[in-house]
């Protein structure tokens, strides 16, 4: 449409960078003597929460074990909005990573990309443990350096802002609710 084809995977790299923030969260359950009896790594997947709820509730055979374990988290990109307050000049000169020649490239267009992180748990304590492992890092933002355009060695700091938190405590539907 507008000239030469290019694809630097900038949005893909941004989605991956967001997801990697949450891929090592654990939930522990303690016994009566305060010794850890289980340590669960919280599963993380890209996709809407409704997809996971539907998979949990699709049980034609009520004796079969559920395929999805809780707690789990999902995330998805849900908004892309132009941010005119961060706009700068149209072109800028970058030196190639090998230092041999100058390359002229367009400046990135400033967009805010919205993500939704969903936490799905059976136990309220699991939700509290997960949230407590996330909140301290966002005051209210967390900066992450991402290699956005590797052909010119462009690394940018991406500020991830935590706007709000909501959590779903999952209660299994009764057999009569399943139809």
Name each model-derived stretch.
Residues 150-169:
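Short, conserved secondary-structure transition motifs
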